[in-house]
């Protein structure tokens, strides 16, 4: 299940990445080409749930991320790091069944795979601060 959920997160990340270059396009439409590659219907539904949730909360996600960036602004981040942080922040704050450690590990892996050699550490540092400052207290007991 973990490997399959990783693929789901990866498809959401790819859609967010592409959307960052095509802001005038609908994120859900962009996501279709990435999410459709997932073999499991339940994972496709989950991916669309993430996409819709991120669309609805993008402004607050960006505000929260900006609050925890040190010596950076959101628009100065690489497209990769910015969208991994959006996905990770959404999962930390709005997805109840995923422990904080799992979210951090998954986002670090996406950073290592798609970002620079420092992306994993950078993403981990920012998301760790966001988790400590913003995540629901119940997530610390999972």
Curated annotation (Swiss-Prot):
A GO BP entry: transcription antitermination
Keyword annotations of the record: RNA-binding, Transcription, Transcription antitermination, Transcription regulation
InterPro entries: NusB-like_sf (IPR035926), NusB_fam (IPR011605), NusB_RsmB_TIM44 (IPR006027)
The keyword Transcription regulation belongs to this UniProt entry's keyword annotation: yes
Keyword Transcription: yes
Protein role: Involved in transcription antitermination. Required for transcription of ribosomal RNA (rRNA) genes. Binds specifically to the boxA antiterminator sequence of the ribosomal RNA (rrn) operons.
Family indicated by similarity: Belongs to the NusB family.
Official protein name in the record: Transcription antitermination protein NusB
Lineage: Bacteria, Thermotogati, Thermotogota, Thermotogae, Thermotogales
